[in-house]
Swiss-Prot record:
The lineage of its organism: Bacteria, Bacillati, Cyanobacteriota, Cyanophyceae, Synechococcales. Its cofactor is [4Fe-4S] cluster. Binds 2 [4Fe-4S] clusters per subunit. This is NAD(P)H-quinone oxidoreductase subunit I. It catalyses: a plastoquinone + NADH + (n+1) H(+)(in) = a plastoquinol + NAD(+) + n H(+)(out); a plastoquinone + NADPH + (n+1) H(+)(in) = a plastoquinol + NADP(+) + n H(+)(out). GO terms for molecular function: 4 iron, 4 sulfur cluster binding; iron ion binding; NADH dehydrogenase (ubiquinone) activity; quinone binding. Residues 55-84, 95-124 form the 4Fe-4S ferredoxin-type domain. The gene is ndhI.
Amino acid sequence: MKDFLQKVNSYIKEAFGAGKYLYDGLSVTFDHLRRRPVTVQYPYEKLIPSERYRGRIHYEFDKCIACEVCVRVCPINLPVVDWVMNKETKKKELRNYSIDFGVCIFCGNCVEYCPTNCLSMTEEYELATFDRHNLNFDNVALGRLPTNVTTDPSVKPLRELAYLPKGVMDPHEVSSSDARVGKLPEEVYDWMKPKTNEMSDPAVKLNK
């Protein structure tokens, strides 16, 4: 009888544990069902990265003095600085500079500590490739400026906060019956119309 009661007690505990596990999972599901959809139709729509977004590193060869500060402050000693000493001028001559973005953690230390500001973080995040060796950028590839989301004619830029009603900063506070993030509210349309008309007016272009 004692063994039977122990089995029943163990079965009840396991049933309660399974029920709690199921409740936790469904509570998350139902919580998201009440939220506003924020689907972005990538790659035809892209969210504009934040002002301090840490994307692909941009490098200016002419500013670099081959001091190797970026190598010393990098947690994984990633940047490869190839230089030779000029015996006549007694100064370093930079030959090549490369960064492997397959290993880079985008911490931004190299940008922060660079004495000549030859390194900067860009908004580019589309670095996917079939061959990981293509992620090893030399000074020529690092020197290319990426296409900005707002200037790319093939992409519709999305400013996430601009799609929310006035005074609302959290998309979860908006009713699910309202328009999705991909549609502009009337207030933003009214704000954009004067600028669009100015750009399309030839008289305004001539005056400028």
